[in-house]
Amino acid sequence: MSDQPDRQTKKPFLYVIVCASGIAGDVGILITAAQDANWGVGVVATPQALGFIDTKAVEAQTGYPIRSAWRSPGDPRPLPPPDAIAVAPATFNTINKWAAGISDTLALGILCEAYGFGIPTAVMPYLNSAQAAHPAYSQSLERLREMGVLIGSYEPHKPKAGGGADQYRWEEALELLTPKLSARA
């Protein structure tokens, strides 16, 4: 295991799982909010999300490397284990794969295992209303709710209308997770 200073100080550790979305570059808003609330933060990005975020800025802000690929056996773990997970922004693709138990990326692998470990998890969807109209989406959200996943309140935006970035409440992930973390303490 790597040196894990957040464990030594008893600071809770949050994994922020970032998906490839037009607002992913604003993930620093959630990181700042979590750090201001005394969380340690590590970022796990889907492979496609790496093209949407400023990786150097995120790594400087968190003090940890961004994880996107599985590590080799025997390599040190670059992040402490999570006390909670926020998936923000969560795309249509990731939500549906996660609910179906598909773990073809590190991010999805972590999410699929989180259920078995009982790690409090919040998902903050960001998608358009045409995607949300697909029956798989509502079924996936229902499955995630049954798994105890906390679902953010973002209402899907109109397709090809500029998105709803101004409506996206990054901090809601912490609002959802904090009571769950307090209950575990």
Residue ranges and their predicted role:
Residues M1-A185:
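A cross-family phosphate/adenosyl-ligand binding-site feature
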